[in-house]
Design a protein with these regions (language model features):
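Formylglycine-dependent sulfatase
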Residues: 1-377
Length: 377
């Protein structure tokens, strides 16, 4: 491993807010994104859009001759301004990026995504039946951007931001990868949580003597759930794990390209999460969260009847919050909360030849707002 692993990295517990801080190097309230981009309260800190007088990292890099590319999630524009007629000033091309391919909202279907190329809404280039998946498509597009850049302007520096739909819900991944995890999580979130803490202590991610807090509020012991619920919950977690592995495989294609094109030693790579694991699946998870969001209950019998559909094109799955608790080991609470489980997140920095202990650990406090000024420096 060549990336430095930061154990004290902090975010803002939600996606839009963290992205605003990441892109500006400032507190998210200070730039107008105190909450999600979906909402505009009218108050200066909560406009659902990065303030026009605050430069983004892409805008600052452009001033130094960089070409800037973005693929994937944006979620930094008010929903009322994401239609085909704009306004476009808050879209990626209006905030310093030269090319954009991705989606504007918080999430999208991985098999039927709501895609935008630059400033134009477009149809997805494939379907589940033709083998399409958004993660692969985004990395394909990122590679096209980089190859085109190198062919046309090899002496011009570039900045690429890759924001996958993974691992935000809906958790959708190829069936063979989901099947791979069929038994991986059969022991449940309590056993998984204990095992992860032991591994964290062994590898130095947390200090010796670190103890788990009690289960989060409303999370029941795995043993208190019925066997058929165990099967459902394990399958939902398997879909999440498969989606993560699927992205990891395709991210590897991007790193391989940097290596093959002899750019890897000149490229700093940062991999981070914008918030902790999500509690939005509730106590039992969802096979079709859209029904629940529209006030249509999803009874346990209905979930169980659709076990084989989980992760496929006709589902919008999310895992139970017991798995989110395990994902945030050894911290309390989740995404949306200002507890450790919401704001302490992974950061890996790969800077070949620039640090003496590539693959080492860093335990100091750092915040997502530190990244833009550090990159600029």
């Amino acid at each position: 491993a060549q990336g430095l692993r930061y154990t004290g990295f902090h975010t803002t517990a939600m996606c839009s807010t963290t992205r605003a801080s990441l892109l500006t190097g400032r507190n998210h309230h200070d730039v107008g994104m105190g909450c999600l981009a979906n909402f505009d309260s009218g108050f200066p800190g909560y406009r659902g859009k990065i303030a026009a007088d605050v430069p983004t990292l892409a805008e600052l890099l452009r001033g130094h001759g960089y070409r800037n590319y973005l693929v994937g999630k944006w979620h930094a524009t008010r929903l009322t301004e994401t239609g085909p007629s704009g306004p476009f000033d808050g879209w990626p091309l209006g905030r310093g990026f030269d090319r954009f391919y991705g989606f504007l909202d918080a999430e999208t279907d991985q098999y039927s995504p709501e895609l935008v190329r630059d400033n134009t809404h477009i149809a997805a280039p494939g379907t589940h039946d033709t083998g399409y998946h958004l993660t692969e498509d985004l990395i394909d597009e990122a590679l096209r951007f980089l190859k085109g850049h190198q062919a046309a302007t090899p002496d011009v520096p570039w900045f690429l931001m890759v924001n996958p739909g993974a691992c935000h819900a809906p958790h959708q991944a190829p069936r063979d990868l989901i099947d791979k995890y069929e038994q991986r999580f059969a022991d449940g979130w309590d056993v998984t949580r204990d095992a992860r803490l032991a591994r964290q202590i062994e590898t130095g991610v947390v200090p010796v003597g670190t103890r788990l807090p009690p289960r989060n509020h409303r999370v029941e012991a795995w043993a208190d759930h019925a066997p058929e619920e165990h099967r459902l919950f394990a399958r939902l977690q398997g879909a999440y794990a498969a989606m993560l592995e699927h992205f990891d495989l395709h991210l590897g294609r991007l790193i391989d390209h940097l290596d093959a094109s002899e750019q890897v030693d000149d490229t700093v790579v940062l991999v981070l999460s914008d918030n902790g694991a999500s509690q939005e699946g509730g106590p039992h998870g969802f096979v079709n969260a859209m029904a629940v969001f529209n006030m249509v209950p999803e009874p346990m019998e209905e979930k169980l009847a659709r076990l084989d559909d989980i992760g496929g094109p006709d589902t919008h799955t999310n895992f139970p919050h017991g798995w989110a608790m395990a994902a945030n080991t050894p911290l309390k609470r989740y995404k949306q909360n200002t507890h450790g489980g919401g704001i302490r997140d992974p950061l890996v920095v790969r800077a070949p030849g620039q640090v003496p202990d590539e693959g080492g650990l860093r335990h100091q406090f750092c915040h997502v707002a530190d990244l833009a000024p550090t990159v600029l420096e």
